[in-house]
Amino acid sequence: MNNVFDQYEVWFVTGAQLLYGGDAVIAVDAHSNEMVNGLNESGKLPVKVVYKGTANSSKEVEAVFKAANNDDKCVGVITWMHTFSPAKMWIHGLQQLKKPLLHLHTQFNKEIPWDTMDMDFMNLNQSAHGDREFGHICTRMRIRRKVVVGYWKEEETLHKIAVWMRVCAGWADSQDMLIIRFGDQMNNVAVTDGDKVEAEQRMGYHVDYCPASELMEYHKDIKNADVDALVATYFNDYDHDASLEDKSTEAYQKVWNAAKAELALRAILKAKGAKGFTTNFDDLGQTDGSYFDQIPGLASQRLMAEGYGFGAEGDWKSAALYRTVWVMNQGLPKGCSFLEDYTLNFDGANSSILQSHMLEICPLIAANKPRLEVHFLGIGIRKSQTARLVFTSKTGTGCTATVVDMGNRFRLIVNDVECIEPKPLPKLPVASALWIPMPNLEVGAGAWILAGGTHHSCFSYDLTAEYWEDYAEIAGIEMVHINKDTTISCFKKELRMNEVYYMLNKALC
């Protein structure tokens, strides 16, 4: 798989001024080059850093920020003030900057050279001074950004920059993201609906409707030989009963049908340039022509693993969010998935929620090799034996997130969770995870419900709330974080204060 981050870069712009003379200008440039080389050579950053020079005037700032806006490879800008850099010279550039901004408050030298420091050294190395000036103008202008404080070689500093870079990549990816809705949302469901125009304006992605009949035109054109080849891939990649390979059985035919559905979905998604899709079990094509005999669950599982966003029952917000999660998660070890809250297990301190769906859970979170099975699925317009991958998730900590439309804004809801080992489910042959929402089921689920959270969410073992805080900052949307320290009383107050803030903030902007 190609590294999704290789197509991107982050620009590094140093702030200074000409007051301190030519030697200072040369030193600032040399230090900046060394720092950028060090950042790239650290092996800790997923995106290449490109030094774009030192800005000593308003025109230079404006020029580099305009260039950043117009370069598709640039997904964000890091600024650092080596010397004092009068902030009025940053105003016009900041007014025009459209890319995510990280303000790095660091210093070329780690420690003060107590015995040798003179006025020349202090004038040259005054990030403590310059970064406060820059920070003031950003705050005065209401510029959303991430501020990272720490020595540029230290692990924690590099980690915070890396988190922001991953979010920037996910954000850049969403700016030309197309989500295809095969059929509409599930009838009468509120939380999966929302304002698609506002979503595109705020988060970048575009949502289109595609009738199932159009998908079926691709389905008709799939060649049997290609289906046979994909079925062979299934049998090679997944555990399964040997009897499943018997071509005379209904079970084999259902696997074959699932492979044909996957090829049809791949073909239409590629043709349309889509990065994600939704399905609806009540819209699977007409019975008088080519049609799916049940929802394309196995196809959805496999496409999610490759990075396609997915949302069940027409949930386009989850489809877009999952694609972003997948991009941010690339190169991290434990995986991510679309999930749905299904069933509660009240068990004292271990009270938990079974996460599953009818079929569509991503195998990236599987604890062991997924097993290909065929079982009856009795929901939707067609009730049929249906192929799917069956597995349980890894155990360990993770973070799940969802976006809901509050009418006057989007709210990102994030919950830290602990995935635990489930008991066997011999009568429920689906993929699943079992987790305890932090701080416990009573508070975690209660806070999620108070926030208006969905029954669908996008989960990752590797992403933390820090990623989502950066995402919400870039998008300019509300975020609430349910964690080990959450109490219902304080959470209610936060929601009420946020309500007032976003009303007033929208009026002021």
Swiss-Prot record:
Membrane-traversing stretches: none
InterPro entries for this protein: Ara_Isoase_C (IPR024664), AraA_central (IPR055390), AraA_N (IPR055389), AraA_N_sf (IPR038583), Fuc/Ara_isomerase_C (IPR004216), Fucose_isomerase_N/cen_sf (IPR009015), Lara_isomerase (IPR003762)
Enzyme class of the recorded protein, top EC level: isomerase
Cofactor(s) this protein requires: Mn(2+)
Pfam family, one: AraA_central
Note on cofactor: Binds 1 Mn(2+) ion per subunit.
EC number in record: 5.3.1.4
GO cellular component: cytosol
Pathway the protein contributes to: Carbohydrate degradation; L-arabinose degradation via L-ribulose; D-xylulose 5-phosphate from L-arabinose (bacterial route): step 1/3
NCBIfam families per UniProt: PRK02929.1
HAMAP family per the UniProt record, alphabetical: Arabinose_Isome
Family, per entry: Belongs to the arabinose isomerase family.
Protein name: L-arabinose isomerase
